Every structure is written in C-alpha cells, then in structure tokens.
Amino acid sequence: NRDGLAQHVLIRNRGTSSMPCLLAFHTAINAPFAPESTADDCVARITIGERWEMSDRMLPTGEFQSLTAEEERLRTSGVNPYFAPMDNHYTAVPQNGRNRMELTDTRLGKTLVYDVGNSYKQWMVWNNKASRKFFCPEPQINLVNAPNVNLPADDIGLFGLAPGDIWEATSRLYLKG
C-alpha cells in the first residue's frame, strides 16, 4: 500500500528471571531498486554516528575510528552506497527525530526510506565488497557482542527484560517522491 511495508516486533519475557534483549535485522536493499536505473544513480543517507573499531574477529574493541569523508557524507548529504567496500558498525544518531536509511534514485527522483525508529541504537552497514547490486543497512538495538563489551550498558544498547516485560518497536519501508 502507499504507506509501505511495516514490521512490528514485540519481545515478551515469559520466563521467571531477567533476560537480555538483543536484536538486529539483516536488511538487504537492492540498489538500484528500479530496473531502468544503475548503481551510479544511487545516493544513500544513514543516521550513523561514530564508527566502532573492530578486532580481527570482527568484534568491537570499545574504541572508535575516525569517519572517512565519504562516511561523513553518508550521514549528512548522502553518497553512493558503493564508495568503498563496507563491513562497518556505527552508533545510531537520529536526525529530525528519526533513525533511518534513505536511498535516493537520482534518475527517477524517488527515495526508498527505511525508518527504524529510535529504539535501534546501532547500525551495521555491509555492501558485499561494493558489489553495486545491494547493500545492507542493518539496524541493531545493541552493539554486537554487547554482553561481553566492558562499556556502560546505555552506550551499547544492552538492557534486560524483567519477567513479564515487553519491548516493542515498529520499522517501515516506504517510497517517497
């Protein structure tokens, strides 16, 4: 429909003790998303903040790396999602009250929006070695390996659900323009 595709997630702790609430989506976006367009017509914006430094095992070290000029554009004016091979983890920093990815097809003047809401505190962005076919803006409520990272729980999205508690969020994919 014209409101796009909504995904509502509800996690309820039916147990008798607190449980960690860890969730991420492995969302793949065809880019270009229109058959008459090319990868060169694509400009992506994502509400990323800082990039996490990763170990050789692809686990966060707890430190941050400087963003490249292209990554700065990824979070501001937009950049082609294939500017370099990406397998990066970032903090999420909402803009205008929203946390989302926007993929604009400059040929068609249309934008695919993936609005994940503000409950997702991290992004993982992977583009299959800059394949020019698809990329994956993956919202995460927590940092990868969060239970084993020695940082404040609020900084890495680590929280628990007490027995009977519910966590829920809604995300949406829609087209504008």
Show the residue positions of the predicted features.
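Short Pro-Gly-centered flexible turn/kink motifs
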Residues: 9, 159-176
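Short, structured beta-strand/loop micro-motifs enriched in basic residues and often containing a Trp
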Residues: 145-154
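Active-site/ligand-binding surface loops and adjacent short beta/alpha elements
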Residues: 18-20, 28-117
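Asparagine-centered strand-capping/turn motif at beta-strand->loop junctions
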Residues: 10-15, 127-128, 175
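A short, structured loop/turn motif at beta-sheet edges
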Residues: 1-4, 15, 33, 105-107, ...
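Acidic, contiguous internal or C-terminal segments within carbohydrate-active enzymes
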Residues: 1-27
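Glycine-rich active-site loops that engage anionic ligands at enzyme catalytic sites
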Residues: 104-144
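Hydrophobic residues positioned within well-ordered beta-strands of beta-sheet architectures
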Residues: 7, 23, 99-101, 135, ...
